[in-house]
Design a protein with these regions (language model features):
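A short gly/proline-enriched turn/hairpin at secondary-structure junctions
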Residues: 188-196
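A short beta-loop-alpha structural element at the N-terminal edge
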Residues: 1-25, 164-187
Length: 320
């Protein structure tokens, strides 16, 4: 039996229900105690329930939310949202299909043109339920987590870079965008034919701008003779940091010009980002490279992750 929750007081057993849910995005980080996962999940659910723009559906053993995304809506030019599926051990295909069907029906009725989601690549039941309701494969990312000590590469192999690595300034904005336009041609936003021209560029532009303004995090650049050779942006993950003093910093965009990739520029940038993040209280650092971005994966292999998890990204367009 499905039930839409519109008031937090209507979910009487919310705390006990949350304890059986497997889908906390950070549950695979063992250093976070169980109460951190619990508090994070409850805050996330509370936000979905209390906003009139969102949907919160609960079944016997699972929860599904649809959260309006201002960021995606502004970039896409149409109403967009993020679907989250929270499963317990007792998940079933039939129940999952019904849950996603009801959620997408609500999204269509409320004029959501675009929905996206991420799901553990091992969750076959959830993936099939999404595909049965017109979600299409978009990408696979590998979430790698390491600590400060593991993130600093003491021995860097390659052609030693002589570039200057520094914090980016607002004057670098145009140069960074020029690099990103040359490099990011394989992102899921570029590859999805349903997106209009320029959508991926607007997404990347917004990420870079917020990093330069330090609204979300920070950005480092590699410079030589007044020309930029690469950049690296990172953001504080405020969702989980609100519940733990062990702060998590998430890598976002990084790129090095093709003719300079044999050098150590990317690893020099990584070192700078990790050291700076650590000075700001960061303990855990998370990378989310695409599973087929082999160049980044090869570089990250020099920094063995503490934890690794594969996630599938799926997109759904209305009437597709």
């Amino acid at each position: 039996m499905l039930k839409e929750i519109k008031k937090i007081e209507d979910f009487k057993n919310i705390e006990s229900f949350a304890k059986k849910i497997l889908a906390s995005p950070y549950r695979f980080i063992k250093e976070y105690p169980s109460h951190v996962h619990q508090e994070h999940l409850l805050k996330k659910w509370q936000s979905s329930i209390e906003s009139e723009k969102n949907l919160f559906l609960v079944s016997k053993d699972s929860v599904c939310t649809v959260d309006h995304s201002t960021f995606d809506s502004e970039a896409f030019g149409k109403k967009s949202g993020i679907l989250n599926l929270f499963h317990s051990v007792k998940k079933s295909q039939k129940e999952s299909d019904k849950l996603i069907k009801e959620a997408t029906k609500w999204a269509d009725e409320n004029n959501f043109s675009f929905l996206q989601t991420r799901i553990d690549a091992q969750n076959i039941v959830g993936i099939r339920a999404l595909e049965n309701n017109k979600f299409n494969y978009a990408d696979i990312v590998l979430r790698s987590i390491f600590t400060y000590e593991e993130g600093i590469t003491h021995e860097i192999y390659g052609i030693k870079s002589k570039t200057n690595v520094r914090l980016a300034e607002k004057k670098d904005f145009g140069k960074i965008l020029n690099i990103s336009k040359k490099i990011f041609k394989n992102s899921r936003f570029h590859k999805d034919p349903n997106f209009p021209d320029g959508f991926a560029e607007r997404i990347h532009e917004s990420w870079v701008e917020k990093s330069l303004n330090q609204e979300r995090g920070f950005c480092f650049v590699s410079e030589e003779n007044n020309s930029l050779c690469g950049f690296f942006t990172a953001a504080f993950d405020n969702e989980i940091n609100e519940h733990s003093s062990d702060r998590l910093i998430r890598f976002e965009l990084s790129a090095v010009l093709p003719m300079r990739r044999a050098s150590t520029i990317w690893l020099d940038l990584l070192n700078a980002v990790v050291r700076h993040g650590y000075s700001k209280g960061g303990k855990f650092f998370e990378g989310r490279p695409q599973a087929y971005n082999y160049q980044i994966l090869q570089r990250q292999m020099k920094v063995p992750p503490k934890y690794l998890k594969a996630e599938m990204a799926l997109h759904r367009m209305k009437n597709k």
